[in-house]
Amino acid sequence: MDRFRMLFQHLQSSSESVMNGICLLLAAVTVKIYSSLDFNCPCLERYNALYGLGLLLTPPLALFLCGLLVNRQSVLMVEEWRRPAGHRRKDLGIIRYMCSSVLQRALAAPLVWILLALLDGKCFVCAFSNSVDPEKFLDFANMTPRQVQLFLAKVPCKEDELVKNSPARKAVSRYLRCLSQAIGWSITLLVIVVAFLARCLRPCFDQTVFLQRRYWSNYMDLEQKLFDETCCEHARDFAHRCVLHFFANMQSELRALGLRRDPAGGIPESQESSEPPELREDRDSGNGKAHLRAISSREQVDQLLSTWYSSKPPLDLAASPRRWGPGLNHRAPIAAPGTKLCHQLNV
């Protein structure tokens, strides 16, 4: 159990591990889908190629799009490419690195499907049975061209009466299946050789640029996650404060209307503070939320989000905040506790 917990924590802390896990999951789903696929070639001249090539290429396209959708870095890459420069320059090298990483993971599942289809050979036989040269086979010598085309169209359907138990059908099917498997194994070997060379030759070159681009691509992912988490934290605190101010205002109104009753033996009403205890505790505890409480109106939140998109701060913690642009210079005043802040928030 501890091993699974450690593995889960590692996947949560590493975006690359999560993406690799999703990539492997898509590949496994691809194998499962193909193994459960019911392949039925139409065995018609005009539709064999359309059906065979469609089954060979359409699912890989869908799997490629799924790979792009589930990869968080694909969205970050487009956002980084299209965002305004602001106070942070855009590095095209990082964008190219992210694009390469996204494409490598998105192409894994489609490649698995294509290799399975080629090694199985059914799609290839259906798609190219009409393209076989009849002169390579002696059994077609006594047939007219029209009979040959009709016969070749029926090759994928071994139970058809026209080609059942025909040596010519077996020869054509065997020829196309061998050709399909040869192409599949060639692609497999090529992919393995390219991956082997990339892994073995990369340490032979300077790793500085690679490490920099990998670092900053991970940084952008983590930065966006932390920004989203901080926004959720601020939204929760914002809603909490608004509700507390609403109850505090209602308490004051009820007191003004004389509808509030003092508890027996309690503290006199004149000695009670109108400030909600939750706000007083948060203000005095110094729990590190002052940077969140400074944003206390809808206009300030909108300005903050707009500034984050249009003018991200520079990657220099020593830089003065005044150099980051207008930011939140025109913030609305923060209302004191007990006032009607919930009417000012307009949320």
Curated annotation (Swiss-Prot):
Regions crossing the membrane: 21-36, 49-71, 99-124, 177-202
Its job: Pore-forming subunit of gustatory voltage-gated ion channels required for sensory perception of sweet, bitter and umami tastes. With CALHM1 forms a fast-activating voltage-gated ATP-release channel in type II taste bud cells, ATP acting as a neurotransmitter to activate afferent neural gustatory pathways. Acts both as a voltage-gated and calcium-activated ion channel: mediates neuronal excitability in response to membrane depolarization and low extracellular Ca(2+) concentration.
Stored Pfam families: Ca_hom_mod
Glycosylation: residue positions: N142
Modifications made to the protein after synthesis: N-glycosylated.
Ranges of biased composition (kind: Basic and acidic residues): 277-286
The keyword Membrane is assigned to this record: yes
Phenotype seen when the gene is deleted: Genetic deletion eliminates voltage-gated nonselective currents and taste-evoked ATP release in type II TBCs without affecting cell excitability or diminishing Calhm1 expression, and results in the loss of responses to sweet, umami and bitter tastes.
Keywords: Calcium, Calcium channel, Calcium transport, Cell membrane, Disulfide bond, Glycoprotein, Ion channel, Ion transport, Lipoprotein, Membrane, Palmitate, Sensory transduction, Taste, Transmembrane, Transmembrane helix, Transport
Cross-referenced PANTHER family: CALCIUM HOMEOSTASIS MODULATOR PROTEIN, CALCIUM HOMEOSTASIS MODULATOR PROTEIN 3
Any one of the GO BP annotations: sensory perception of taste
Catalytic activity line of the entry: ATP(in) = ATP(out); Ca(2+)(in) = Ca(2+)(out); Na(+)(in) = Na(+)(out); K(+)(in) = K(+)(out)
Region of interest: Disordered: 265-290
Subunit structure: Associates with CALHM1 as a pore-forming subunit in a hetero-hexameric channel complex.
Tissue: Expressed in taste bud cells.
Resulting phenotype, N142Q: Loss of N-glycosylation. Reduces channel conductance. Does not affect channel trafficking to plasma membrane
Organism annotation: Mus musculus (Mouse)
Residues carrying lipid (S-palmitoyl cysteine): C99, C200, C204
Positions on the Cytoplasmic side per record topology: 1-20, 72-98, 203-347
Entry's Gene Ontology cellular component terms: basolateral plasma membrane; plasma membrane
Ranges facing Extracellular side: 37-48, 125-176
Protein name (record): Calcium homeostasis modulator protein 3
Disulfide topology: C41-C126, C43-C157
Location in or out of the cell: Basolateral cell membrane
Membrane topology note: Multi-pass membrane protein
Family to which the UniProt record says this protein belongs: Belongs to the CALHM family.
High-level lineage: Eukaryota, Metazoa, Chordata, Craniata, Vertebrata
